[in-house]
Design a protein with these regions (language model features):
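Bacterial N-terminal signal peptides that target proteins for export
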Residues: 2-17
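Calycin-type beta-barrel ligand-binding domains and close structural analogs
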Residues: 29-45, 53-64, 72-191
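C-terminal motif of bacterial Sec signal peptides marking the signal peptidase cleavage site
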Residues: 24-27
C-alpha cells in the first residue's frame, strides 16, 4: 500500500510549492507517491507568468510563478527569483479521476511525492484550484473504513492515508471533499 498525505495549509506552499506550488504549490493537498487517474494534456497556452493568491494563506499572497509547457504531458513550475531562493522547479500533471479534474504537483522534497488540488476552473488567463477540506477528508476516510495518521513538521501537520483509500474517496466523495477547501487563484500576468 502506498502512503498518501493530505497537506494541511497552503502556508507551507509559499515556503517550501513552493519547499513547496501546491513542502512546494505544497501546502494543501494529499501527498501521494504518484498522480492518480487518467492523464490529460497540459495546454501550451498555459505557459508564462502567473500571479498566485490563496484564500486565508499568508505564505503565497501575490507571488509570481513561471510555468513552462514543453511536451503537453506536464508543466514545469518555478517561483520567480525573489520568492524562490533555493527552491527547485517542480512538475505538475493534470489528471481525470471520476468526474473530477485534479492538478498533481511534485513536492520537491526528499520524500518524493505529489500534492493535489481540484481544478475548479481553467482558462488561458485564470486557473482556480481548490484544496481538499481536511475535516471532510477525515470523515470520508472513516466512512470508508480508513483512518488518517498525522505527522508533525516544523510549520504544519500532515495527514497520511494509503493511495487506494484516497482513490476511493475521490471516486465516491469528491464533491464533498473539496467543499469549503482553500481556493488558490492563478491569474496570468500580461506584459
Amino acid at each position: 500500500m502506498r502512503n498518501v498525505t493530505p497537506f494541511k495549509g497552503w502556508r507551507s506552499v509559499g515556503l517550501v510549492l513552493l519547499g513547496w506550488l501546491l513542502v512546494c504549490l505544497a501546502g494543501c493537498g494529499p501527498r501521494t507517491p504518484a498522480p492518480l487517474g487518467q492523464a490529460l494534456p497540459v495546454s501550451a497556452s498555459l505557459a508564462g507568468l502567473w500571479r498566485v493568491q490563496a484564500d486565508d494563506v499568508g505564505g503565497i499572497r501575490a507571488q509570481v510563478l513561471n510555468v513552462e509547457v514543453s511536451n503537453g504531458e506536464f508543466a514545469t513550475l518555478q517561483w520567480q527569483p525573489e520568492a524562490a531562493e533555493g527552491l527547485p522547479s517542480v512538475r505538475a500533471y493534470v489528471r481525470q479521476l471520476g468526474a473530477q479534474q485534479l492538478l498533481f504537483v511534485e513536492t520537491g522534497d526528499a520524500q518524493k511525492g505529489y500534492y493535489f488540488a481540484a481544478l475548479t476552473s481553467v482558462s488561458d488567463h485564470e486557473i482556480v484550484l481548490t484544496a481538499p477540506n481536511e475535516k471532510r477528508l477525515k470523515k470520508a476516510s472513516k466512512a470508508l473504513g480508513g483512518k488518517l495518521k498525522y505527522q508533525s513538521h516544523w510549520l504544519h501537520r500532515e495527514a497520511h492515508l494509503d493511495s487506494g483509500l484516497l482513490e476511493k474517496i475521490l471516486e465516491q466523495k469528491s464533491g464533498e471533499l473539496f467543499t469549503d477547501g482553500i481556493r488558490i487563484r492563478l491569474q496570468k500576468v500580461v506584459r
